[in-house]
UniProtKB/Swiss-Prot annotation:
Active site: 13, 156
Protein keywords: ATP-binding, Isoprene biosynthesis, Kinase, Nucleotide-binding, Transferase
Top-rank taxon, per record: Bacteria
Gene3D superfamilies on file: 3.30.230.10, GHMP kinase, C-terminal domain (3.30.70.890)
Catalysed reactions, semicolon-separated: 4-CDP-2-C-methyl-D-erythritol + ATP = 4-CDP-2-C-methyl-D-erythritol 2-phosphate + ADP + H(+)
Name this protein carries in UniProt: 4-diphosphocytidyl-2-C-methyl-D-erythritol kinase
Function: Catalyzes the phosphorylation of the position 2 hydroxy group of 4-diphosphocytidyl-2C-methyl-D-erythritol.
Length: 311
């Protein structure tokens, strides 16, 4: 066990392609998606709870959890938080593997990823907690065990743990690497109010639509490293549902393209709008133009997934 704070980076994501098939018996939808990990991130710090005298065997490994940064008040600080659940599952696996009892921890989350914004902020926090707890517990769990825990926590957690550019199938948790050249530059526009992922999926189930499940052209474009070619193949089946629930997103997409973006797309279930740009300068210009009316940021991808700082 360590006696010092461990800080991990929780990278956000954008879906370059999100094809949504039919609902399964378990309530999930069959997905074909291409994820790209972005530099916009949260940070997770795991610290031994020095003043906590309770036994992790009886009370659980997490003593307390706090949240700071963007929209911190909207993030739960109890066991409903995925980061809390990630820590508990890691500790349980550690003990099953014969690991020694550990001192309870405090988890501090500093938010940079928008809450309920379609960029997997909660999943990324869980993934980074897995990385931090692995080090805290002495790395007694294998990578495959950690990925299995990630899949139990949520569909986006395995990708946010691994990062880079990957094809996701099943409910998004079955991942294979995608060859991608170059760095892609994004301008991001955030909405003041989040969108519920289940609500967006319920809406799409009510719509007459044809799923887009072929990513051949996008994968070929990614190999070239040409943002113009990639922009031509960005697609999100959930976008129509998100626009139906939040019609103002259509205006944001139009404004971003008019400001110079190559293409704009609703990120995941929304409401964040992501604009692929030709270069860093254009991304800055698009973000600046949109910042008159919205909160914005710039990001690059692909980047590493969850990792402990300095490792």
């Amino acid at each position: 066990m360590t006696s010092y704070a461990i800080t991990a980076v929780a990278s956000s994501k954008v879906n370059l392609h999100l094809g949504v098939g039919n609902a399964r018996d378990d309530g999930y939808h069959e997905l074909v998606t291409v994820f790209q990990s972005l530099s916009l991130h949260d940070t997770i710090t795991v610290t031994p709870a020095a003043d906590d005298m309770h036994d992790a065997e009886d009370q659980g490994i997490v003593a307390t959890l706090s949240v700071s940064g963007d929209s911190a008040q909207a993030v739960p600080t109890d066991a409903t938080n995925l980061a809390w659940q990630a820590a508990e599952k890691m500790y349980q696996a550690h003990r099953r593997n014969g690991g020694a009892p550990a001192k309870r921890v405090h988890i501090a989350i500093d938010k940079g990823i928008p809450v309920a914004g379609g960029m997997a902020g909660g999943s990324a926090d869980a993934a980074a907690t897995l990385a931090a707890m692995a080090q805290y517990l002495g790395n007694t769990n294998t990578e495959q065990e950690i990925l299995s825990i990630a899949a139990e926590l949520g569909s986006d957690v395995p990708f946010t743990y691994l990062g880079d550019t990957r094809l996701g199938t099943g409910r998004g948790e079955q991942l294979v690497p995608v060859l991608s050249r170059g760095t892609y530059h994004w301008a991001l526009a955030f909405s003041a109010q989040g969108l519920s992922t289940p609500e967006v999926f319920r809406k799409i189930d009510q719509m007459d639509r044809q799923p887009h499940l072929d990513v051949t052209a996008l994968n070929a474009a990614l190999i070239t490293g040409d943002p113009h070619k990639v922009a031509a193949h960005l697609h999100n089946d959930l976008q129509a549902a998100a626009l139906s629930l939040r019609p103002e997103l259509r205006t944001i997409l139009e404004q971003g393209r008019a400001a110079g973006a190559l293409a704009g797309i609703v990120s995941g279930s929304g409401p964040t709008c992501a604009f692929l740009c030709e270069d860093a300068e254009t991304a800055q210009a698009v973000a600046a133009e949109l910042s008159v009316h919205y909160r914005t940021a710039v990001a690059t991808g692909p980047v590493r997934g969850a990792h402990v700082k300095g490792h």
